[in-house]
From Swiss-Prot:
GO terms for cellular component: plasma membrane. It is found in: Cell membrane. This is UPF0154 protein BPUM_1692. It comes from Bacillus pumilus (strain SAFR-032). Keywords: Cell membrane, Membrane, Transmembrane, Transmembrane helix. It comes from the Bacteria. Its main location: membrane. Disulfide bonds: none annotated. NCBIfam families: PRK01844.1. HAMAP family: UPF0154.
Amino acid sequence: MDLWVVILVGVVALLAGVALGFFIARKYMMSYLKKNPPINEQMLRMMMMQMGMKPSQKKINQMMKAMNNQAK
C-alpha cells in the first residue's frame, strides 16, 4: 500500500473514534443527569421542610454555597 493511504486510513479511524467517544460520553452524561439531577434551592427547601426545619432564605443560601464549594 502507498504511504498516503495508510496515513489517510489512520486519520479517518482516529476521527471516527473521537466522534464515537464524544457521542457515547454525551449519552452517558444525559442519562446520568436524568437519574441524578443536581440539587437546586427548591429541592433543598423541601428537604429541610421534611426534616422539620423551617427553611429561611439565608440558611438555604448558606447550604447551597457550602455544597457548591464542596463540589469544587
